[in-house]
């Protein structure tokens, strides 16, 4: 009968404890991700800044009441004549004041603007969640729809805001939908970074644009940089394939996630002018 060498028992015991500590560490890491996930998903700048102070004096600040009682800020620039009105949903970081250059570009030709500051961002009450952001979008849509016909309303979603814009366009009539750096779902984006974690099972706010985009009937423009290392363009291409409405995909060579500027607005104006 073979006798095990003492070193073998020690090695197996060490391996056993190594596996146990690895599993405990992994479990603790996953638990921490779950508990803190919204702090990792939303990065609000909470300071309330008047449009004029931010550099957009033609905008009026309005306060909207969401269905669940939160009060959210929006900036409103009325259009000239029969120009379209862009209902703008920003990304997961910053606030409206950091997007003033974009708003100037959008309104330079007389187009109108309603730019929403989500709950927890830039003077709005509450804390961001997917359900909450969609409620905020519905409040902003109601404000806009009360003043302008649906066919003049253009939804513009930026990054995380594409999930909000798609959710709104899937249930309310609009003239056009513009998606800048969109994704199939926020879980798919998260899985790019946390590939070793079951993100789809743990994530609360998934913004499943892939399940909603098929209900959109308005023409859709997708804008994406091919150097985007936050939302890979492959996710936008997958979402694009699910669109049933008239659509166009504009790719920007050498452009990263946060680098789309006036060229995006120019592409959007061309798209809107052809309809």
Positions of the model-derived regions?
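Primarily recognizes the serine-hydrolase "nucleophile elbow" in alpha/beta-hydrolase
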Residues: 142-146, 150-196, 212
């Amino acid at each position: 009968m073979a006798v095990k060498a003492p070193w073998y028992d020690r090695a197996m015991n060490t391996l056993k404890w190594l596996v146990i500590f690895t599993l405990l560490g992994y479990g603790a890491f996953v638990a921490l991700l779950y508990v803190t996930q919204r702090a990792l998903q939303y990065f609000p700048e909470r300071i309330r800044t008047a449009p004029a102070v931010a550099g957009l004096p033609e905008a009026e600040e309005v306060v909207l009441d969401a269905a669940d009682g939160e009060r959210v800020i929006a900036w409103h620039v009325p259009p000239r004549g029969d120009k379209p009105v862009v209902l703008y949903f920003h990304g997961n970081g910053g606030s409206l004041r950091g997007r003033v250059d974009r708003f100037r570009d959008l309104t330079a030709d007389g187009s109108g603007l309603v730019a929403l500051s989500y709950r927890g961002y830039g003077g709005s009450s509450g804390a961001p969640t997917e359900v909450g952001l969609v409620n905020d979008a519905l409040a902003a849509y109601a404000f806009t729809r009360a003043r302008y016909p649906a066919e003049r309303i253009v939804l513009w979603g930026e990054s995380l805001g594409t999930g909000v814009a798609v959710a709104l366009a899937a249930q309310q009539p609009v003239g056009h939908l513009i998606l800048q750096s969109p994704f199939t779902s926020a879980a798919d984006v998260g899985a790019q970074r946390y590939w070793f974690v079951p993100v789809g099972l743990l994530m609360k706010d998934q913004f499943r644009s892939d399940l909603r985009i098929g209900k959109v009937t308005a023409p859709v423009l997708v804008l994406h940089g091919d150097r985007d290392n936050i939302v890979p363009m492959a996710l936008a291409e997958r979402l694009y394939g699910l669109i049933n409405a008239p659509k166009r995909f504009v790719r920007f060579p050498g452009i990263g996630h946060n680098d789309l500027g006036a060229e995006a607005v120019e592409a959007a104006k061309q798209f809107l002018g052809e309809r």
